[in-house]
Amino acid sequence: MAEVSKKRCEHNSDSQCEGCKANDKACEARDKTKETAGSAKDKTKETAGSAKDKTKETAESAKDKTKETAGSAKDKTKETAESAKDKTKETAGSAKDKTKETAESAKDKTKETAGNVRDNVENKDKNEVYENIKEGGSKAWNKTKEVANSMKDGIKDLANKDEQKK
């Protein structure tokens, strides 16, 4: 810069005039400003690039975390469904066994009643025996129907509870 100023300066001496010195200082300040602005521009680009990369990284991390959470929820739902299914099977099996026991009990009771009626046949006339048989059979049949309906309602309740859990 000094040489440029000297070339413009028309002094014969090596020392510059005040105008040339001021001009050189202005040029230096301008160059320094350009340099500082360029440095700031580069720093801004670098910071923006870093922020962009960080944002991208954070988004990828959030995406992976979301996938992981969704997978975990899916697995948990599957486990719960399997558990409910197993519980329903177990309850249905229990109800089936209970129904079978009740039916066998009703069958035994019917046999017992029939045996008692048969024992009384010898002592009573035929019409009375017929009425006793009819009454005993009717009671046993009604009891069997009542137990079957009760079991049927119980199984329906279990199925409804299973559906509600899902």
UniProtKB/Swiss-Prot annotation:
Segments of this protein annotated with the region Disordered: 1-144
Organism domain of life: Eukaryota
Sequence repeat intervals: 31-41, 42-52, 53-63, 64-74, 75-85, 86-96, 97-107, 108-118
Sequence segments annotated as region (8 X 11 AA approximate tandem repeats of D-K-T-K-E-T-A-G/E-S-A-K): 31-118
Keywords from the UniProt entry: Repeat
Residues of the signal peptide: none
Record's compositionally biased regions (Basic and acidic residues): 1-13, 21-112, 119-137
Entry similarity comment: Belongs to the LEA type 1 family.
Classification via PANTHER family: DAUER UP-REGULATED-RELATED (PTHR47372), LATE EMBRYOGENESIS ABUNDANT PROTEIN (LEA) FAMILY PROTEIN (PTHR47372:SF5)
Protein name per Swiss-Prot or TrEMBL: Uncharacterized protein ECU03_1610
Organism of derivation: Encephalitozoon cuniculi (strain GB-M1) (Microsporidian parasite)
Lineage, broadest ranks: Eukaryota, Fungi, Fungi incertae sedis, Microsporidia, Unikaryonidae
